Amino acid sequence: LKRYMALLWLAFFVVLSAAATTVQAHAGLVGSQPKDGEVLQVNPGQISLRFTETLEPDLIAIHLYDWNGEEIRLDRPTLQPGDATQVNAQLPELKEGTYVAIVSVVSEDGHPVEERLSFSIGHKSAAVADPTEKKQDSGYLIVYRYLTQGIILLGGGLYVLAWRGQRCGLPAFSQFLGVGRQIGWGLALVGLVFLWFLYDEALTAVSLTEALCLGNWSVLMQSPFAMMLLVSFALLILLAIPNMITGWYVVLWLALVGLQAFGGHAWGTQPVWLSLILRLLHVLTVSVWMGALVYLLLTFRHAKGNERFKTFFLRTVAITSGLAVLTGLVMLFVQTDAILILQSSMTWSYLLYGKVVAVCGMLAIAYRQTMSWRKGNDLRAKLLRWELILGFVAILAGLWMSQTNYPTAAAAKAETVSIQHQQ
């Protein structure tokens, strides 16, 4: 076990040394022309907005409203030639008064982002109606993503542990879950469908459902999150094929679990290859770690006195928990730094604190249980349940973090601009 941990620490420092310092969060507005709140003497002719990262032309929408809240039709926005971080929209003839522009874009990591700015021509209007468009509430998306991806992560980890545990004389996957397999599969499938429509609704620039029906893959492939949902759906269908060899299901489960790493912040962090590898390892190890705990709880009686399984279980949990913690730490160094986290008042930072507390609690309980088990004592089911509860809290915090901006220099600048917009 000491050799495994030594290799893990070596890998940690090697990967950390390769980490780049240039990172991004979700696309954030860092500048505009005209400036927010500016009073112009004449029509500027176009609106220009600059973001913290490159944008996809098919996933941009700009809506302009006058002081009465009436929408003014604009031509399709275009990217600045040679600079994909800037989007421009030509303005028609405009009367004197105040106008509000709502800009909807999609980050490199697939998250929808909405920004607003106002400007006036000639003079500010005495009263300005609030445009009808509102920012999308991501609460439902977080809940459905937690439930759906939680089922997938636990299902994959459970199957891998049951596959190995069966060699130690413990029940097979189908034996201890029974009809629960079909229920979990159905819930995951329905959850993916709900996630698709919730995500599609959050995109104002394009309809992914329409693009899917028309076979417009050039648009679909611009959204990593949409592609993750589609491929996950296909893999779940393949998992339903009966009477295949065990290796078929093992490979599909690992692919399905690993795929969940490709729908978050990874695409917005440079270098992308390192970010994807870290997230892939993190998701896979968390899946096996949590799956091992659930498997032990479900086969509690069968595991008693089984020394072969105990050795396998302790080694598996030690390696996966160590890798999960190490990859999580490296991702922090790649994405941001401790000073920015401590100085930030962003939701992401508070979620990180909660995740750290939950993981530390899991490790403390695991250490106590391991020491007791090694001495020949029985495991305590109550402590095992608490360890699982803390694990579910950590997963929820992690998924929520993937839906929110994390603190970086660029994100801090965007946050400052956003505050200025509100003043």
Predicted stretch roles:
Residues G28, P57-H63, D75, A84-E96, ...:
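Polytopic transmembrane helical bundles with strong interfacial aromatic enrichment
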Residues L40-V42, Q80-G82, L94-E96:
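Surface-exposed coil/turn segments at beta-strand junctions on protein surfaces, enriched
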Residues Q24-N43:
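N-terminal edge beta-strand
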Residues G37, N68-G69, G110:
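Detector for glycine-centered tight turns/loop "hinges" at secondary-structure junctions
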Residues V14-T22, Q403:
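C-terminal segment of classical bacterial N-terminal signal peptides
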Residues I47-D75:
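Short, surface-exposed alpha-helix to beta-strand junction/turn motifs within ectodomains of secreted
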Residues L1-L8:
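Bacterial N-terminal signal peptides that target proteins for export
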Residues P34-K35, L74-R76:
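Surface-exposed, proline-enriched loop/turn segments that connect beta strands in immunoglobulin-like
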